[in-house]
Amino acid sequence: LIHALLGAVPEQFHWILELAGLQGAASLGLSEMDEVLNANNFKMYENEVLFLLSFLQINLNNNSELCQKYLNKIGEGYKENILLNFTAARLLHNLGQNDFCLKVLENRPSSESTFPFYYLDYLQGMSYMYKLDYDNAKQKFEYFINNFKGKNYIKSTYHKLAWITYLRGTEDNYFNSITNEGNASIDEDKVALRDAERNYITHNRLLRARLLYDGGYYEDALLEISSFKVVGKNSMYFDEYWYRSGRIKLELDYDDSEVINNFEKSYNIGKSTANYYAPMSALQIGLIYEKQNDFSKAESY
């Protein structure tokens, strides 16, 4: 674990590790923990190791085959152990298997026998959102808001409730709640606050396409985004449109040239704005060229 965490330290801070005589590599730490997972004499720690390995893998290497391996190792354990339920749900989301993720969350151990883990209600609400099931999503988000006594994910939850009313075409000013409730320590809450301060929600078709994409429903996302009209009145959304189109087509194994073309359009349109679509498009192009072993182009992007 220490090797993995030290290996995750950004390069600009390696001098601190060297000063302290420390060294590590994420791949080394993960492989060492993988050995622990398979060792009979550490069987008593299997659940904890599975949890740590899964989240380190998602955040450091993001190897789909290993994520699937850990998911298989969990098996039906998610029904009996709340930690494994959380782990399985995050692995499945990372693998784009939202229907299975929802099944896992719906079949978690009863909260009567465990300390309440309200974040799982938030995750379940998100899983419903990815299916565009607004009724069930709203129910879960409201349950989370009414029961969770912490500060994180509160703004984010109100943000999702604002999305639901917007996508339904109804009126309800959740933006006031985003501004006044919770805090903005984590990224999800920061994004919610920023959008509330700007009174901004993207085009409804792009938002639906984003949600479907995040749930792994790539064909449905493509169908949704294809109905977006690339016309002058929608010009403020063009950088997002081309970025999301590129991401969807990348998952659907479209030809690299078409995917790159989409990302280049997003980059050229958005590079003079504060939106994140241009830099993210450049990153995706760089990753494609890296995969093609065209390292000079990859580095330039």
Give a label for each model feature.
Residues 21-38, 138-149, 155-187, 264-267, ...:
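TPR/TPR-like (Sel1-like) alpha-helical repeat modules
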